[in-house]
A protein has these predicted regions:
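N-terminal helix-turn-helix DNA-binding core of bacterial DNA-binding proteins
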Residues: 1-31, 51
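Histidine kinase transmitter module recognition
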Residues: 4-7, 48, 66, 70-73
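Conserved anionic group-binding/transfer micro-motifs
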Residues: 15, 63, 74
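Amphipathic alpha-helical dimerization/coiled-coil segments
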Residues: 68-90
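Basic, amphipathic "hinge/linker" alpha-helix immediately C-terminal to the N-terminal HTH DNA-binding motif
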Residues: 52-71
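Beta-hairpin "wing" of winged helix-turn-helix
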Residues: 40-52, 58
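Basic amphipathic alpha-helical segments that dock to polyanions
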Residues: 32-34, 38-39
């Protein structure tokens, strides 16, 4: 969800569709709102003023920092995995 919100503010439906498109994961309403509640509690996202009964969310600076750390770690692990697979092919 942080990856989705890094691309701009989104309300729940737009967030669900975006995550489904780039990650292939369908988030149910319970899962979505529980995750948003945790992210908001941890100050990684903030809820903005409602627009036409839709409540958009925005990633915070702290959320961007956490996302950058997670992406760097994922990149490091992917690189290590590819290196080890190449060694195993020899």
């Amino acid at each position: 969800m942080l990856t989705s919100l890094a691309g701009g503010d989104k309300h729940a439906y737009a967030l669900t569709k975006d995550v489904q498109e780039f990650a292939g994961v369908t988030l149910g309403p319970g899962t979505l709102y529980a995750a948003l509640t945790r992210l908001e509690r941890d100050e990684l996202v903030e809820r903005l003023e409602a627009e036409d009964r839709r409540c958009p969310y925005r990633i915070t600076q702290r959320g961007r920092e956490v996302l950058a750390q997670r992406l760097a770690e994922s990149s490091r692990l992917a690189s290590l995995g590819l290196q080890r697979m190449a060694l195993g092919d020899k």
